[in-house]
Amino acid sequence: MLDAISAEALKFKRHRATWGLVWIWPIGLTLIWLIAIAVELSGVGGEAGGDGRGGLTAAGWIADNVGFWGVPGDTFGRYIIGAFVAVVFAGEYGWNTWKLIVPHRARTSLIAAKYAIAFILLAIGFTLAALLFNLFGWLTDVITGDSIPAGITAGALLKAHGAGALAALPAVLLTIAYVSLAAILTRSTVAALVIGLVVTTIEQLFRTFAPMIEPSAPSLVGALYEVLPGYHVANVASFATEGRVLEIPFPSGTFSTSLGTSLAITGAWIVALVGLTFWSFRRQDIN
């Protein structure tokens, strides 16, 4: 298993897909900040001297500066995650390398290694980007002269980063599960990406618009809202960042569930999709 993970790490840590879809977050943030601060200091964007954040409380400043953790769970962020996962899982088919690897290693360990390296690289990329986002927020205030609120501690920052990471985790894992299964079933990077984009978009759209369409089929819409993962992913994120249940107003009444229920349903979807991926690959004819 460790050999398989090492092989995947060697393959993907410098792969173009990793540079373009994982390392792009910290690199892109750095470039954007450098451009923004240059514009600010040059006075091109208006009079320099602060961005108006001086009146923030410590809690507000921390919330602003750990805000990058909203990106992995956002629709666009999930699209980028899906693109990377599609390359990791379907790339072997396009490169015709499975037939060279499969006879020498257990198929279960091969897929497990892909899950491990995809998650590890994404975790490193997003964590580095989130920490840089925090650092750049502080540097911006220092350079522009905005006051930094008193009472900000390392412990409070770490707690906020941890909550943000936990809030993003279900969406990231679910996206990995969607796209990995599509990659194994279709054997195509493009098809896996398209399926991942479509499923993620439908998930988000249904969560948003279900209250509007409920009157046309109340029982069906209500049942789907309870069992599909969209609401439950958002509910876990709400608990992680705000400490409260996510309440969705429907014409028939407010919909909400407990954290335990949302964790169970989200976990069941992830386990089922990942399990299907392992099962499908073990039965697949590799030519």
Region locations from a protein language model:
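Helix-capping/transition residues at the boundaries of transmembrane alpha-helices
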Residues: 11, 90, 102, 179, ...
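Secretory targeting signals
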Residues: 18, 26-87, 112, 116-186, ...
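Transmembrane alpha-helical core residues of multi-pass small-molecule transporters
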Residues: 24-28, 117, 129, 196-203, ...
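Transmembrane helix boundary and interhelical loop/hinge segments in multi-pass membrane proteins
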Residues: 82-103, 107-108, 115
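Transmembrane helix segments
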Residues: 31-41, 189-230
